[in-house]
Amino acid sequence: MIMRRIQVTETTENKDLVQGDVQAETATEEVERSEVQEEIELSVEEQYEANVAELQAKLDDDEENRHLRLRADFDNMRRRQQLDGEAAEKYRAQSLLSDLLPVLDNFERALQVETTSEETASIIKGIEMVYRSLLEATVFEGLQVIKAEGEQFDPNIHQAVMQEQDSEKETGVVLRELQKGYILKDRVLRPTMVSVNE
């Protein structure tokens, strides 16, 4: 009987040891599971934080790009306005001068009339003074007469109305000026009507 008691005691001790081992394994597994769970949670949080940081960087880049584009657009608009303002200032008299060209033509025709009387000569003298004054004002605004006779024909500033033949001159040379042409700064207001050598 004593032997049996020892065996029972040993068996109970074995059971306690086995249960202790099982509990220890279970506890170890639970600790490992919680550590894995924490790692998963950390990695998910890290991923979220990384995604948030990446999206924030993209947003900052987009905002900076938008700011740079707006700045460039503003600079371009200001430059365009400045160029438009300069062009408007440079050519402000264009419309008025275009309207005055027929007046200048009429003054020139009036000055070509030959007079025999003293009274008519004084009127012509007055017309000439007005013409010169008007011409000075137009030159002050930048109006220039286009040179034509003896020049090579240039379709940008000359308008060929007829062709004539002169063997002493080169082909394409302007022989006669039929109506004066004018340039304002660098724009042609009216091309010169010319006769060109064949």
Swiss-Prot record:
Keyword Chaperone attached: yes
Example GO biological process: protein folding
Localization per record: Cytoplasm
Listed GO CC annotations: cytoplasm
Alphabetized GO MF terms: adenyl-nucleotide exchange factor activity; protein homodimerization activity; protein-folding chaperone binding; unfolded protein binding
Top-level division of the source organism's lineage: Bacteria
Record's keyword terms, sorted: Chaperone, Cytoplasm, Stress response
InterPro entries linked: GrpE, GrpE_coiled_coil, GrpE_head
Cross-referenced PROSITE patterns: GRPE
Subunit structure: Homodimer.
Protein family according to the UniProt entry: Belongs to the GrpE family.
Functional description taken from the UniProt entry: Participates actively in the response to hyperosmotic and heat shock by preventing the aggregation of stress-denatured proteins, in association with DnaK and GrpE. It is the nucleotide exchange factor for DnaK and may function as a thermosensor. Unfolded proteins bind initially to DnaJ; upon interaction with the DnaJ-bound protein, DnaK hydrolyzes its bound ATP, resulting in the formation of a stable complex. GrpE releases ADP from DnaK; ATP binding to DnaK triggers the release of the substrate protein, thus completing the reaction cycle.
Name of protein: Protein GrpE
Organism: Lysinibacillus sphaericus
Lineage: Bacteria, Bacillati, Bacillota, Bacilli, Bacillales
